[in-house]
């Protein structure tokens, strides 16, 4: 019989989800009772050399060395530990394919062979093979990763202040009941500053180190900061158009941060910005875009303004744009 070729593409889902997809592939192959070969295709870093097509980034060679070490020794659990930010800076395009293949060999003893690595033109290429040798109960890597992740989330929850705790409780209550958490259920446990002051608030949600939702208000629209957090936590988890609504089975994996915005002030130009200290608001007519300060992957003022322009729908070369800056008090961390 002729071999059957099944092509499966990657996605923007998490590394854990791709590993899980690999497990499902293995389950399907097992039910068919056929010999199966899995090919995980994709380049390594595209940022190995200045003269290469995508330039140089320090994370490029670091990624290639790390991925070849991991794959060369079949340490598949470590594939799940690569952060989204690191992979993005490295400019790789194969990591999710590799992770899916690894998932298909979860719980299996594997004989790895590292055949080659090269990157002569600024893009990394590696070849490894893996031969399944039978079962190995010490190699259920996704289960171990999820247990570690849950423990880390639990420790973060223990350290949450009132702002972050309220954001978490607000979204969890909504996901469970489809109703907003009533103020009388939480107000007695909140510090006075959350009940007496008004400010714009952004709530950010991360999962596996990647953004899962972020919604906020530039100026206050609720009676106090606590109400602002409740509204924006639910909006970030349910109504951010970039992501599907948070599911109940995700709640224990989420990490929250709350940014309370200070007063905005107009500035003359980019020279008055600092990406670590100040957020920026870019405006033209009715178009307005905001970007918070001190975000992973935003390292220059030019990047910061460019992203804010994009969010506002203002072209990169459009004139007549006004800039404002603001500071925030950040509660929690960004994943």
Regions found by a protein language model. Give the residues of each.
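Flexible, D/E/H-enriched segments
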Residues: 1-24, 31, 50-165, 245-249, ...
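Basic nucleic-acid-binding interfaces
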Residues: 148-335
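A structural signal for small-residue-enriched, beta-sheet-centric alpha/beta enzyme cores
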Residues: 41-52
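Short glycine- and Lys/Arg-enriched binding-loop motifs that mark or flank ligand-binding interfaces
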Residues: 38-39, 90, 209-212
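Beta-strand elements within well-structured catalytic alpha/beta cores of enzymes
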Residues: 8, 34-42
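Acidic, glycine-rich active-site loops and adjacent beta-strand->loop/helix elements
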Residues: 12-13, 44, 262-264
């Amino acid at each position: 019989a002729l071999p059957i070729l099944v092509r499966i593409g990657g996605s923007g889902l998490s590394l854990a989800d791709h590993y899980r997809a690999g497990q499902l592939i293995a389950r399907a192959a097992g039910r068919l009772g056929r010999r199966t070969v899995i090919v995980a295709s994709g380049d390594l870093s595209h940022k190995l050399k200045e003269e290469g097509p995508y330039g140089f980034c320090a994370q490029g060679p670091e990624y290639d060395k790390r991925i070849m070490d991991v794959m060369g020794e079949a340490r598949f659990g470590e594939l799940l530990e690569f952060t989204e930010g690191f992979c993005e800076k490295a400019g790789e395009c194969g990591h999710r394919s590799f992770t899916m293949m690894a998932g298909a060999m979860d719980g299996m003893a594997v004989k790895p062979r590292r055949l080659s690595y090269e990157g002569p033109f600024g893009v990394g290429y590696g070849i490894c093979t893996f031969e399944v040798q039978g079962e190995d109960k010490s190699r259920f890597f996704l289960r171990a990763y999820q247990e570690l992740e849950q423990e880390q989330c639990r420790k973060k929850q223990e350290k949450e202040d009132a702002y972050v705790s309220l954001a978490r409780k607000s979204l969890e209550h909504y996901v469970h009941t489809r109703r907003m958490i009533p103020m009388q259920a939480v107000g007695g446990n909140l510090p006075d500053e959350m009940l007496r002051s008004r400010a714009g608030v952004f709530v950010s949600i991360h999962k596996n180190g990647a953004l899962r939702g972020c919604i906020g208000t530039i100026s206050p629209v609720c009676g106090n900061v606590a109400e602002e957090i409740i509204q924006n936590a639910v909006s970030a988890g349910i109504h951010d158009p970039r992501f599907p609504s948070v599911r109940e089975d995700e709640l224990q994996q989420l990490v929250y941060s709350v940014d309370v915005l200070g007063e905005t002030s107009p500035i003359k130009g980019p020279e008055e910005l600092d990406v670590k200290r100040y957020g920026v608001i870019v405006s033209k007519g009715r178009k307005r875009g905001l970007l918070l300060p001190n975000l992973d992957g935003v390292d220059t003022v030019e990047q910061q303004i460019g992203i804010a322009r994009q969010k506002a729908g203002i072209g990169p070369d459009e004139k007549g744009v006004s800039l404002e800056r603001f500071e925030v008090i950040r509660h929690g961390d960004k994943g």
